[in-house]
Amino acid sequence: MRIPRLASPLLLIALALIGGWIAAWLLLPDEVAHLSFLVTIKLGIEVTALCLLLGSFPLYAALRQPKWPKLPHVLVAVSLGSLLIPTIARSLSLSALFSFYGPLATGLRVMRLWPQGQPLDSSHAAVVIALVTLYLPFTLLILSESMPSLGRMPDVAGTLGAGVLQTSLRVTIPRLLRPLATAGLVVFSQVLGVIITPRILGSEDVTLAVLIDDLLKRTMNTPEALRIAWAEMALAIPVAAVAAYFIEKERTARARPLQPALRFRGGRVLSVIPLVILAVVPGALLILSLGHSPILSMASLFQSGPTLEWFRRALLEPGFRRVLLPSFMVWMAAAAFSIFPALLVSVLILPYPQVRRSFRLLALVLLFVPQNALGVLLFMVLSRFPAAQASIPAWLLGGMGQAVPGFAFAFLLMDRVGDRLRRSLALASTLGASAWQRLLKVALPNLAPSVAAAFVATALITLDDIIFVRYLPRLPVNTAATELFGRARYGAAPDLAAACILMALFILLLVACGHIAREFPAIRRRLVASVGRPKVAAELGVEGAR
């Protein structure tokens, strides 16, 4: 009875991986590309295995331990918080940690665990560790949506006499195989297109994404870069499609709350591991970055905090001030080209469940495929129309490119309230509401939180993206992300820590605004309750007033 449940996901994964690998191998032009393909596969497997190992066991232990019931929520909150910090900022902090004179490399050399003359930051181990810290939140978030569906089944199996190994093989692994496979496929697909972290660390590993970047920006070999990009897409699209299919299947799976075990030792200890990786290590790296900041001294930070004078000096830095307006314009363009089409599409396809499902799968695939290969393909499309792209401002082209993942994310956010919105619109139509009333009083209030969240998501994409502005077919627009990436890569001496902190604070401010917009109905109800009911409530009763 258990064999089909195990065989179906494994067969899909095997077909996707083998088919993608064969297609990519045949599309690659030469031996250098084949070697980069092998390096990419090796790096993806290592990062995926470590993310699953460090994410699945601690999260399962946190859900099963009875002492701290809020611990799983803490893990999810820390994972979401770590995703708010741009990848460039996190990579810069990791670069400070892994640098030749950094604390980690110095300590390893003192303990004779690392060769004296060999740098740590450009090593393969540093890249793997850095990518694990970047993609571990994805694993925790995906698994946290599916692990509660186990319910009391592990306890029931133990009560019936099943051992730990037998319970794992017959109960736990079959039920969690699909979410584990989903998390692994998502992480693997993201590693395929990673550029920022290896470049900032100065890695010697030449992956397919790095090879494409070199061909486009150094040797200007556009045809070969396009061919490798097609190979990367052939490798990633089957993986992304299977991951999207598994996520869609998990949406319809029956979920039961995972109750704490009666006796489960070591859960809190295991749960500390991802907390240290996602919370303590970034905090220490932030302090380390501040210590190397030429603008902000540690003494003034602890005495008076990040004062307005510090913000003024950071904002007056010429390079940072020069990219503020282009970054804002790219963000606005990306928000406009992603939110409004997603809003229109999500409303138009509400009565068609199969069309909604197809759009969900397409949006997930667009999010999971490597963004660098997608940027190269958009680069080639724009190159076919030189007159049109010459008349469009560079910031608008960059925003249009970033709108591709932005549209996918915005549509998924709005589709989450699609069923409720469809029922509300049907009820309003039954009660005789006009089309404008249904739009203004039903559709927009239901979609407003999703629109606000999508607005914040486009800000995250803009502040963390270098691909869609770096691969423009003419002189690219310089944004905050490209400025930080260029300075970190080419060894300039700006105040990178100050700029990263400002970016992080700006993102947190946007998230706070989105959270307030989402919770506005509840806040309004609390205000009404605190002020008092109107007089009609006293005359007609609470239910009549409602």
Q: What are these regions, as identified by a protein language model?
A:
Residues 1-148, 175-196, 228-241, 266-297, ...:
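Membrane-water interface segments at the C-terminal ends of transmembrane alpha-helices
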Residues 243-270:
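Flexible interhelical linker loops that connect adjacent transmembrane helices
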Residues 158-159, 163-167, 253-262, 299-306:
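Juxtamembrane inter-helical linkers in multi-pass membrane proteins
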Residues 157-160, 428-431, 524-540:
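Short, highly charged, low-complexity non-transmembrane loops/tails of multi-pass membrane proteins
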Residues 65, 153-177, 421, 427-447, ...:
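Short helix-to-coil transition segments within interhelical loops
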